[in-house]
Structure formats: C-alpha cells, structure tokens
C-alpha cells in the first residue's frame, strides 16, 4: 500500500539540529522520517525514542551487512526500539536476509538495498565486478530479497516497474534520490520527481535536502507531498 507521506531524511549531526528542524512543522503534523547512520551513531537509541514520543513514524536506515547471526541479533535490538522500517544490504545474501527477518519479526517493514542510487553502471562493473547491466543486477537482488521473506527493496524509480514485474505488485519499492520538479540532482545519479515516482509505482519516497535545506521546510514538504499524491 502506498505511503501518502514522503519520508523526510533527517540527515543531521545531532538531536539539537533535528529539534530545530522539526520546530518548523506544526506540532500535530505526524511525519515519516528517516534516521541514517550519522544521526543514529551520534545519538544512539535515544533519538528513536524522542521521535516516537513526538508521534512520528521512523525508517531506521542502517543498511546492515554482516554474518547472519550478527544481523539477526542486531535486528532483535531494533525490533525492541519499535522502528517502523529498517533495511539490510541484499548483497549480504539470502541467509543473512532470512536471519534479519527472524530477528526483526513481522511488526516492522524490512527492505533490502539493491544498488545505491549514487552507483552508476560503470562503477558497479568496476568496483563490484558485476558484469550484468545495472537493471539486471537490481532485479536479481530484489528476487533474492523476496525469496528471503523481505517486504521489499530500496531502488531507483527507474527500476520499480521491472522489480514489480519480476516479483509481485505488493512487493514494496522505496525510492530515494527524489528531487522536486526543477530541483538540483546533487550526488544522486539516478533520480526522479515525486510525480514520476508515483506514476511508475513507487510505494515510498525519501526526500532529504530539498526539504531540510529549504528556507521554508513545511511549505516545501506540503508541495512535495501534494505532487507525490497527485502523481
């Protein structure tokens, strides 16, 4: 089921910056936010508790990639935190992903990273020695994630249709690298607008700097939300 709220990437160095940012939103505006490595490693589980107390939904973006036993144990800890969504690297393999599913349980959405949106096909071939096309590699990872019992994948909007054709229509596709119409691309190499992502079938979108660096974050958020839901 499509999430109507764009997920806001809280790419900040600490809690004070997060608080200053969230103060620009109405207190009753319940957001869906992404906590990544920088913020989580700086603040620890306390930042999750703070955001939950504010009533926000949380995608904890740590991209776990380790041996199955370690990942399963880590996921048990994340399950106790009560996050709404988290992820692993599909490159860790089916057994690792199955272990992640066991550890997290069924109450939270578990997705796998296929290829980072900053990765080009040339980089994939040179750095990872994967000689298929980028799209073929992404679809393969998505199929392995589905086999492992995950709910979906992180992928570029350019691959959503291919992934759903290769898996199922209810296999979740979360799309980062979203930029509003007319926005700067930044360091993302495979990007789309919110409307494009909606039309192509994305279930979740993640938006960071266009909102967090905006002079008027709440108005920008509402504009992106409207474009996403109108798409």
Swiss-Prot record:
Protein known as: Orotidine 5'-phosphate decarboxylase
Keywords, in A-Z order: Decarboxylase, Lyase, Pyrimidine biosynthesis
Entries under NCBIfam families matching the protein: PRK00230.1 (NF001273), pyrF (TIGR01740)
Similarity section: Belongs to the OMP decarboxylase family. Type 1 subfamily.
Residues bound to substrate: 11, 34, 61-70, 117, 179, 188, 208-209
Disulfide topology: none
Recorded GO MF terms: orotidine-5'-phosphate decarboxylase activity
Superkingdom as given in the UniProt entry: Bacteria
UniProt key word Lyase: yes
Record's subunit section: Homodimer.
Organism whose genome encodes this protein: Streptococcus suis (strain 05ZYH33)
Chain's role: Catalyzes the decarboxylation of orotidine 5'-monophosphate (OMP) to uridine 5'-monophosphate (UMP).
EC number: 4.1.1.23
Pathway annotation from the record: Pyrimidine metabolism; UMP biosynthesis via de novo pathway; UMP from orotate: step 2/2
N-terminal signal peptide: none
Stored Pfam families: OMPdecase
Cellular component GO terms, alphabetical: cytosol
GO biological process: 'de novo' pyrimidine nucleobase biosynthetic process; 'de novo' UMP biosynthetic process
Record-annotated active site: 63 (proton donor)
């Amino acid at each position: 089921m499509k999430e109507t709220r764009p997920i806001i990437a809280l790419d900040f160095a600490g809690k004070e910056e997060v608080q200053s940012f969230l103060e620009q939103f109405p207190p009753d505006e319940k957001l869906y936010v992404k906590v990544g490595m920088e913020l989580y490693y700086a603040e620890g589980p306390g930042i999750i508790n703070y955001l939950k107390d504010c009533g926000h939904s949380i995608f904890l973006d740590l991209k776990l990639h380790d041996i199955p036993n370690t990942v399963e144990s880590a996921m048990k800890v994340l399950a106790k935190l009560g996050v709404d969504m988290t992820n692993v690297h599909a490159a860790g393999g089916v057994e690792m992903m199955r272990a992640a599913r066991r550890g997290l349980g069924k109450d939270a959405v578990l997705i796998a990273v296929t290829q980072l949106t900053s990765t080009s096909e040339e980089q994939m071939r040179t750095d990872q020695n994967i000689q298929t096309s980028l799209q073929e590699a992404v679809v393969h990872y998505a199929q392995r994630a589905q086999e492992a019992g995950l709910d979906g994948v992180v992928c570029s909007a350019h691959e959503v249709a291919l992934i759903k054709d290769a898996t199922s229509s209810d296999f979740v596709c979360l799309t980062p690298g979203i930029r509003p119409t007319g926005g700067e691309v930044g360091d993302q190499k495979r990007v789309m607008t919110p409307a494009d992502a909606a039309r192509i079938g994305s279930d979740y979108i993640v938006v960071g700097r266009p909102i967090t660096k905006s002079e008027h974050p709440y108005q920008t958020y509402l504009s992106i939300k409207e474009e996403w839901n109108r798409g």
